[in-house]
């Protein structure tokens, strides 16, 4: 089984700019990618990365394409005649068990939705009869595409896999629930604050009341 992980090399996670510096965003993105690729490899999945410019990554083949995301991924599907996974690079809570549970499904298409109508992971057993359409309400689009092509589907319901890190408000899930290097790094540069009622991730220097989690991992 192969998995393709799209990864943006430059100007990564710009929607986290309200909290993190460009250097911090870049480091966090790389650590999330490391957590994800390590998890996939532990589940016996061969990892390939899809990027728009060359870079090196241990343990994965890097595929460079100048095309936009959808055309690049659809070219990839056309070039494969065996099952493949498409995994987004911002779901660092995904576990080996999550991956193995998806692989155990007999459905032609296994889809794990993201929050807000997106699609975080797809397992595609018939890439010759399927194409992707990311952005917008892509979960509904992918369910429709599968139905139109006569493919069976399973919606994989998982907190871990649905928790994508796009905006500053999403970081709370990684901070509290993360066990990998991305979470450790986030905890080293931020703290939790509940001075406004709902807990959120802030910078240490903020003049706010920090919340310490019992047993919180550091480092």
UniProtKB/Swiss-Prot annotation:
It catalyses: (2S)-2-phospholactate + GTP + H(+) = (2S)-lactyl-2-diphospho-5'-guanosine + diphosphate. The keyword Nucleotide-binding applies. InterPro entries: CofC, Nucleotide-diphossugar_trans. The keyword Nucleotide-binding applies. It holds the Pfam family CofC. GO terms for molecular function: GTP binding; phospholactate guanylyltransferase activity. Pathway: Cofactor biosynthesis; coenzyme F420 biosynthesis. It is an enzyme of class 2 (transferase). One of its GO terms (biological process) is F420-0 metabolic process. Its EC number is 2.7.7.68. Keywords: GTP-binding, Nucleotide-binding, Nucleotidyltransferase, Transferase. SUPFAM superfamilies: Nucleotide-diphospho-sugar transferases. It comes from the Archaea. Belongs to the CofC family. PANTHER family: 2-PHOSPHO-L-LACTATE GUANYLYLTRANSFERASE (PTHR40392:SF1). Guanylyltransferase that catalyzes the activation of (2S)-2-phospholactate (2-PL) as (2S)-lactyl-2-diphospho-5'-guanosine, via the condensation of 2-PL with GTP. It is involved in the biosynthesis of coenzyme F420, a hydride carrier cofactor. HAMAP family: CofC (MF_02114). Homodimer. This is 2-phospho-L-lactate guanylyltransferase. It comes from Methanocella arvoryzae (strain DSM 22066 / NBRC 105507 / MRE50).
């Amino acid at each position: 089984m192969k998995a393709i992980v799209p990864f943006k090399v430059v100007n990564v996670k710009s929607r986290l700019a309200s909290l993190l510096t460009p250097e911090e965003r870049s480091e966090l993105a790389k650590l999330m990618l490391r957590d994800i690729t390590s998890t996939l490899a532990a589940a016996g999945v061969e990892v390939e990365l899809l990027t728009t410019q060359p870079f090196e990554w241990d343990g994965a083949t890097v595929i460079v394409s100048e095309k936009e995301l959808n055309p690049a991924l659809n070219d990839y599907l056309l070039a494969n005649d065996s099952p493949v996974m498409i995994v987004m690079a911002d779901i660092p809570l995904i576990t080996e068990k999550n991956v193995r549970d998806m692989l155990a499904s007999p459905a032609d298409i296994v889809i794990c939705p993201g929050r807000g109508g997106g699609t975080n992971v797809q397992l595609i057993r018939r890439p010759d009869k399927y194409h992707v359409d990311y952005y917008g309400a892509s979960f509904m689009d992918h369910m429709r595409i599968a139905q139109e092509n006569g493919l069976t589907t399973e919606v994989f319901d998982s907190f871990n896999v649905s928790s994508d890190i796009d905006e500053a408000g999403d970081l709370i899930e990684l901070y509290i629930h993360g066990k990998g290097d991305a979470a450790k790094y986030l905890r080293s540069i931020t703290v939790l604050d509940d001075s406004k009622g709902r807990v959120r991730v802030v910078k240490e220097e903020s003049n706010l009341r920090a919340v310490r989690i019992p047993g919180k991992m550091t480092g």
